[in-house]
Amino acid sequence: SPWEILAQPFEPDISKQRLEVLFDPLRQRLPALLARVPATDGAAAELPESLQEQLSIDLLESWGYDNQRCQRSRSAHPFSCTLGPQDYRITTRVVAGQPFSCFLATAHEWGHSLYEQGLPHDQPHAFPWPLGDATSMGVHESQSLFWECRVARSEAFARRWHSGFCL
């Protein structure tokens, strides 16, 4: 399939058929689940850009951000990259009217960096060889989505950070 051709460089051991077995049951149940999600009240819709940026910095610091090894910047589209075993960089963005966008993008991109920092870079000859490289793009993305969706969107996390989003 066209999907498999495009996915092979990133996920060589996965097939469209294998993914359909995994996702078809979810596809059937997802509409009912989404219908149960309450609408937001927009309480934080006008959070100033400077506060959004500060909250993202506070988040990084609470998760062990080290400005000697890490760099955070602002860009049009969030991304992360590792330039060496002690050089992790992420960018985030601020979107007017979407106060959680910067915070969640920061959580996601920092998740990529945390995964990279957990690779065995301290082993001889690990970087930039396969031993010191991510298993796959899917595993890499799963780790960043874990921090964004399972941690930063959790009820306990919301309780901890709620006051920062209220003016």
Q: Language-model segments: which ranges?
A:
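Active-site recognition of the HExxH zinc-binding catalytic motif
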Residues: 94, 99-124, 141-145
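Long, amphipathic alpha-helical stalk/connector segments used for oligomerization, subunit docking
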Residues: 151-167
